[in-house]
Amino acid sequence: MDHIDKKCSMNAIVGTTNAGKSTLINMLVGRKVAAVTPKVQTTRVRMHAVLNNENVQLIFIDTPGIFSPKTKLEKFIVKHAWMSLKGIENVILLLDVKNYLNKHIEKIISRIKQSNINAILVVNKIDMVSQALVDKAIEYMYSLHNFSKTFTISALHDIGLNRLINYLCEISPSGPWLYPEGQISDAPLKFFIAEITREKLFLSLHHELPYSLSVVTEALEEKVDGSLIVKQVIYVTKDNHKTIILGKKGEMIKKISIESRSELEKILDLKIHLFLFVKVRELWQDHLNECVGYVE
């Protein structure tokens, strides 16, 4: 297919923490490319996820939730969220309908207005509330901004996503694809593998741990038999956080390792040898490049 016949668009997904951005990304692409947990602020850097639909390539930018930053890490997170609005065709404001009065919504809409980018409202989690509440949330959102289009969905249960995809394909401009066919994400393998382990940590310990932990994939080594050795360091800020992750007689970290390895083997279709280490680094949030690997 000649590139003249092709269409391509960049679509940033923004919203408050836990609006369901990563779940939506994964459902749209049809494969896990972003960590999904009930803990707020699990997306830390911008990531491109790719959906090819016939002659159209839709690129979705998974962004951190918008919140009030305090530490250097949090400021970094928010800065990169807003950077996602540069050079794109559409901004999708994903709204948790149960939390439509969130105090950060107006701030997000203010930045969207400044960007002068086509804004689409996507109301999520409609399966959890009444239609009356959905209507009330939409009315409130339109009192803040005149969105070009509105969709009501349940990302978790794949309700309403086809209508959103069809609309984005319809309005995408003509142009060459930015990613080769078959590629679903621009996340480096080390980062992607770390995200899987970080997800398992939050799912197992989100009631006990803050989000201020990081997983770094320090080494990947392919063995002769084709299997992959993965060595990861889990950075925490306090000794008691390390104790929680290790668990009694090492049972918790063993559980997390098994769950992470199992999912990685399923996704990568490889035998994985996963080694997890836990290190305490006070205020690691202020040493991003040293122990987290973020690059501005």
Swiss-Prot record:
GTP binds at residues 15-22, 62-66, 124-127. Keywords: Cell inner membrane, Cell membrane, Cytoplasm, GTP-binding, Membrane, Nucleotide-binding, Ribosome biogenesis, RNA-binding, rRNA-binding. Residues 7-174 form the Era-type G domain. It is a peripheral membrane protein. Residues 41-45 are annotated as: G2. Residues 153-155 are annotated as: G5. GO terms for molecular function: GTP binding; GTPase activity; ribosomal small subunit binding; small ribosomal subunit rRNA binding. GO terms for cellular component: cytosol; plasma membrane. It comes from the Bacteria. Residues 124-127 are annotated as: G4. Coiled coil: none annotated. Belongs to the TRAFAC class TrmE-Era-EngA-EngB-Septin-like GTPase superfamily. Era GTPase family. PANTHER family: GTPASE ERA, GTPASE ERA, MITOCHONDRIAL. NCBIfam families: era, PRK00089.1, small_GTP. An essential GTPase that binds both GDP and GTP, with rapid nucleotide exchange. Plays a role in 16S rRNA processing and 30S ribosomal subunit biogenesis and possibly also in cell cycle regulation and energy metabolism. This is GTPase Era.
